[in-house]
């Protein structure tokens, strides 16, 4: 058995002991830092500009916990987490995070629902979990009600997480439903709750969130994300960057949905290490760029599709003052070397930090150090992360530059999926997580092992027995300036078994389709082997179906093909 490990340790001062719910631990970090020196607030709401300080958040968590206890008849030390569940179907708001921490204060858990989900998807998740209420926004209320109709009016209670007026549809009239702000005001008048009796051992494995998987290859599954997993991922990330950050805290950008593992992990990791998060309700290019200058944001957490848009429209980077930016972290989808080169050319002083992770891994599993960027790499394994690469023959891949499916172990991994007869256990009998991603290790010029994530097992295309990685072909196609976005899938072929097909979104002024089709085929055939050739299997589309984190939904494209 060949096991690849992180070269970085976790310091002795960085404890993985879960002595309280993860949100409480994060606030304690901020409060401790504030006693030593001036610190920035954990969260800034970009819409209002309001800074949320740790003391204020702590009080609001307590007030909401009090009122939830009264509303639902809950007590901190009575019942199990599964007796105290709420669903959150919302855009990003600071109260989204505070509400979840209030539920944790009562020993409960939260079912997270992507704001892009349909009524049917929401109903399917709600049907599997007994929720006391669903918290949503006014713009999402109609979909919420449709989902409840599918379940005969369950859950009975709906509460509103307020969003800025400018996010409301034109002519919208607010409902008369109780808001979280009103709940917090009521909670402030109620008696204090008894302390939560937290068991550090059992608390490590206690479920904090039910988080939907991306659903890129099929129906969403509900992953059980634990308090211990979230804390571990925060500690792993801090330890990974200890050398280059030297304990410095940063102001970071986040528009990634808090219902997605990437956004949720950031919310807890940044808070746990004392950073300040500038939180957006969702991605809006003009608003995002403006906030970087307004709040002097230092670190950008992005996804490759947005980086692609910026590199293809470089004037956007000159519209506002971006002098505060020092680093860009990217994940949720492959970050090809051509994209990395494009951004590095435009902003050579920015540290590019591609990473890799997945819902089942509990967030980030690898990250590029600021001082060891390698184009095309997904970075270095986080401390305490172990990886095996399993070949098609079921044997461990040995050495570097040998591909295999990534099996991993880490204290951050989920506790499995919510039980479903149709959901396969993602773990092997000896505890390795089968990620479904294909990767390999290469050594950087500095002599450090980097992980390269090549593609998904489910997405690999078999042409005459030869494997074609869609991500490799996609990265190659994106070298053409006429292509804005692309997704490649495999389609049946009588002679070859399968062949690649490309769905392409054209860039502006791309020219006639037939001419572009010819250019694409010449480009591919001149540089890639015959199994990669597209021929007539090129379809031009106005846009690609995507998940809330920006991944192309290839299951939708396969159904269309």
Curated annotation (Swiss-Prot):
Any one GO molecular-function label of the UniProt entry: CoA-ligase activity
Record pathway: Antifungal biosynthesis
Annotated InterPro entries: AMP-bd_C (IPR025110), AMP-bd_C_sf (IPR045851), AMP-dep_synth/lig_dom (IPR000873), ANL_N_sf (IPR042099)
Binding site for ATP: 213-221, 354-359, 437, 456, 551
Pfam families membership: AMP-binding, AMP-binding_C
Key words of the record: ATP-binding, Ligase, Nucleotide-binding
Enzyme Commission no: 6.2.1.-
Region SBD1, annotated ranges: 284-354
Signals that turn on the gene: Expression is positively regulated by the cluster-specific transcription factor frbF.
EC class name: ligase
Location of region: SBD2: 355-417
Applied biotechnology: FR901469 inhibits the activity of 1,3-beta-glucan synthase from Candida albicans and Aspergillus fumigatus. With minimal inhibitory concentrations (MICs) against Candida albicans and Aspergillus fumigatus of 0.63 ug/ml and 0.16 ug/ml, repectively, FR901469 displays greater inhibitory activity than other 1,3-beta-glucan synthase inhibitors such as, WF11899A, echinocandin B, aculeacin A, and papulacandin B.
Similarity comment text for this entry: Belongs to the ATP-dependent AMP-binding enzyme family.
Function: Acyl-CoA ligase; part of the gene cluster that mediates the biosynthesis of the antifungal antibiotic FR901469, an inhibitor of beta-1,3-glucansynthase, exerting antifungal activity against the pathogenes Candida albicans and Aspergillus fumigatus. FR901469 is a cyclic depsipeptide containing 12 amino acid residues and a fatty acid chain. The NRPS frbI contains 12 modules responsible for the formation of the depsipeptide backbone which is denoted as Acyl-Thr-Ala-Tyr-Val-4OHPro-Thr-Thr-3OHPro-threo3OHGln-Gly-Thr-Orn-OH (C71H116N14O23).
Domain text: Both substrate-binding domains (SBD1 and SBD2) are involved in the substrate recognition, and are sufficient to confer the substrate specificity.
Protein name listed in UniProt: Acyl-CoA ligase frbB
Species annotation: Dothideomycetidae sp. (strain 11243)
High-level lineage: Eukaryota, Fungi, Dikarya, Ascomycota, Pezizomycotina
Gene label: frbC
